[in-house]
Amino acid sequence: KNLPMQAKSFAVGVRAEHPQKMINASQYGAESVPGLPAAPYKVTAKLENGRGVYSFCMCPGGYVVNSSSTENHTVVNGMSYHDRNSKNANSAIIVSVSPKDFGADDALAGVRYQEKLETENYKRGNGLIPQQLFGDFCDDRLTTAYGDFSSCTKGNTVFAKLNGLMNADMEQSFKLGMEHFGHLIHGFDRKDAILSGMETRTSSPLRIKRDESFESNISGVYPCGEGAGYAGGITSAAIDGIKVAEAIIKKYRPDFK
């Protein structure tokens, strides 16, 4: 028996770095507040074109990480150590994508789209993390030097143009999102904000189908969590796991309390 699958919407983008002191000043009202850790943030925007732009996996006092797992693919993520003591804050700033962006609508269309972005990103940086300042990204220009602050990364970097990795509508959405976030957090859209490409694995690009009882077409198989396409992070995966566990109990141990 086959498990039916379908392509699903997800989101892709880049890691954006800012000075942690700038984020602290916006969130706390001061660059440093005794007793408070490096400040986090969460920003979202719903654009008129229907796309969403939002922060994902924000890392206060953190590092941009080369998290590539496949040959000739480059992918970034973010991390913070327990004490959150790096000089920069970083977060993925991602744009929603749907099957209409994939160029096909079969179950693996999103996977192929994801792989296409990762391999092109690899070429841009020749295996290193490609970086571009936001101002240069807006002007379609190669970055030649950092601005008032430098990058905090786990992995080697190189200046390269990130323009054209996303399609024109997505690029414009990203720029509009950054500008909007600049109204929420002063300096968020500063010209020397550092962009690292690309963040492509925010959630699964496909979904294993299940019915209203959370069960697939195969009895006893319950697609669940992030890999099955029903979550986009630790918390949402945990919640989906609880729902599936409750469904299993209801079916096999209805008398359980």
Segments predicted by a language model, with ranges:
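Residues forming the flavin
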Residues: 1-257
